[in-house]
């Protein structure tokens, strides 16, 4: 009786890994033994970078807001303080988008934040 090696299932499993390794360089896309390691490592990078992406976008939004606010004569932290004082609850994603795409709307928000800071500072000086 011939030896059963579960051939069709093994071939399917190897083919699936090799298809996922398509585009990798050299033997990492040709040989199952190395393609498997490369695909598993790629999955680790994918998982890690899905988590990192959130922080990277937050840093990008902060940089864009900071650049727009500095052009208008405030720092990022003072601007955020002004937004809080003016009870403006816009997140950084929306603020960054406004700073890049709709400067008039951003100017209105900036003016409100600056006014709130001045009112807050004036109240602190009077106290």
Swiss-Prot record:
Ribosomal protein listed as a keyword: yes
Biological process per Gene Ontology, one example term: translation
Gene3D superfamilies reported in the protein's UniProt record: 6.10.160.10, Ribosomal protein L20 (1.10.1900.20)
InterPro entries per UniProt: Ribosomal_bL20 (IPR005813), RIBOSOMAL_L20_CS (IPR049946), Ribosomal_protein_bL20_C (IPR035566)
Gene Ontology molecular function terms on file: rRNA binding; structural constituent of ribosome
Keyword flag rRNA-binding: yes
Organism domain of life: Bacteria
Keywords: Ribonucleoprotein, Ribosomal protein, RNA-binding, rRNA-binding
A Pfam family per the record: Ribosomal_L20
Gene Ontology CC annotations of this record: ribonucleoprotein complex; ribosome
Function noted in UniProt: Binds directly to 23S ribosomal RNA and is necessary for the in vitro assembly process of the 50S ribosomal subunit. It is not involved in the protein synthesizing functions of that subunit.
Protein family per UniProt: Belongs to the bacterial ribosomal protein bL20 family.
Name this protein carries in UniProt: Large ribosomal subunit protein bL20
Organism, as annotated: Akkermansia muciniphila (strain ATCC BAA-835 / DSM 22959 / JCM 33894 / BCRC 81048 / CCUG 64013 / CIP 107961 / Muc)
């Amino acid at each position: 009786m011939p030896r059963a090696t579960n051939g069709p299932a093994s071939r399917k499993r190897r083919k699936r890994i090799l298809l996922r390794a398509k585009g990798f360089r050299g033997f990492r896309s040709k040989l199952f033994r190395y393609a498997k390691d490369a695909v598993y490592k790629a999955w680790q990078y994918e998982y890690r970078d899905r988590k990192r992406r959130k922080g990277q976008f937050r840093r990008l939004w902060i940089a864009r807001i900071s650049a727009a606010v500095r052009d208008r004569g405030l720092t990022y932290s003072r601007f955020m303080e002004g937004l809080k004082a003016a009870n403006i609850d816009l997140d950084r994603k929306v603020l960054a988008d406004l700073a890049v795409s709709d400067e008039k709307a951003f100017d209105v928000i900036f003016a409100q934040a600056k006014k709130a800071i001045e009112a807050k500072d004036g109240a602190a000086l009077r106290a």
